[in-house]
């Protein structure tokens, strides 16, 4: 693990400790008066790949969510200037990935979607990825417009609202999608156990015989 990754994990540990081990319901504990919003219930029959909005990735690519189909995805919604929950959410997604047996890892994509249409441009997201050593092919950071972001959040069950200071209150949620973009597992809260998410990913990969492709 390189120094950037170690630095990122240190930030996550500090943020997670300050923020608390599990604020999956409601919280008013950080210095920005951030409120954690509980996630909505969702249907596991709906695919996010039916959404036709356009996104820009941190590498400058324009894509739709359907371009991700064919492999399981670990997805979370964050914003780049968040210094409390969001770094922990990113690290939680990485914890899921790193807990997979190595032969499964190349069949999984990690996708971070920003709430912050104004500040999290593709360039800003690329800088975020570079800063924390998240620039390899497994990671995709996405920027979209307000309607596109809202539609995705609704299907994922992520609640968020923009505050007067430009920051966001939001749900802390890491979601596992199957190859067709349907929800198969969710982790709500911060620094939560990842075993169920890992098992869900392995099942998707095995059921679709992806190891043999």
Residue locations for each model-derived region?
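Bacterial N-terminal signal peptides that target proteins for export
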Residues: 1-7
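N-terminal signal peptide c-region/cleavage motif recognized by signal peptidases
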Residues: 15-17
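Histidine-centered metal-binding segments
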Residues: 21-37, 213
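N-terminal "domain-start" segment that seeds a small globular fold
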Residues: 32-66, 91
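Short loop/turn microsegments at loop-to-beta-strand junctions
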Residues: 50-51, 73, 171-173
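Short active-site neighborhood of thiol/selenol oxidoreductases, capturing the structured segment around
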Residues: 65-93
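Structural microenvironment flanking redox-active thiols in thiol-disulfide oxidoreductases
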Residues: 90-152
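Thiol-/selenol-based redox modules, centered on thioredoxin-like
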Residues: 163-213
């Amino acid at each position: 693990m390189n120094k950037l990754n170690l630095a990122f994990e240190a930030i996550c540990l500090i943020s997670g400790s300050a923020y608390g081990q599990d604020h999956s319901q409601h919280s008013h504990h950080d210095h920005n008066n951030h409120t954690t919003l509980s996630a909505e219930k969702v249907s596991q029959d709906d695919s996010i790949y039916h959404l036709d909005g356009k996104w820009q990735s941190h590498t400058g690519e324009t894509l739709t969510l359907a371009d991700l189909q064919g492999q399981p995805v670990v997805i979370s919604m964050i914003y780049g200037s968040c210094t409390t929950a969001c770094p922990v959410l990113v690290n939680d997604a990485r914890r899921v990935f790193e807990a997979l047996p190595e032969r499964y890892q190349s069949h999984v994509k990690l996708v971070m979607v920003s709430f912050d249409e104004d500040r999290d441009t593709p360039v800003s997201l690329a800088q975020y990825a570079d800063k924390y050593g998240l620039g390899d092919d497994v990671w995709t950071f996405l920027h979209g417009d307000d309607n596109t972001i809202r539609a995705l959040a609704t299907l994922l069950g992520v609640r968020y609202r923009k505050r007067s200071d430009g920051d966001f209150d939001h749900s802390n949620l890491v979601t596992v999608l199957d190859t067709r973009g349907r929800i198969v597992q969710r982790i709500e809260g911060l620094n939560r156990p990842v075993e169920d998410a890992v098992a869900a990913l392995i099942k998707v990969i095995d059921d679709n015989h992806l190891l043999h492709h």
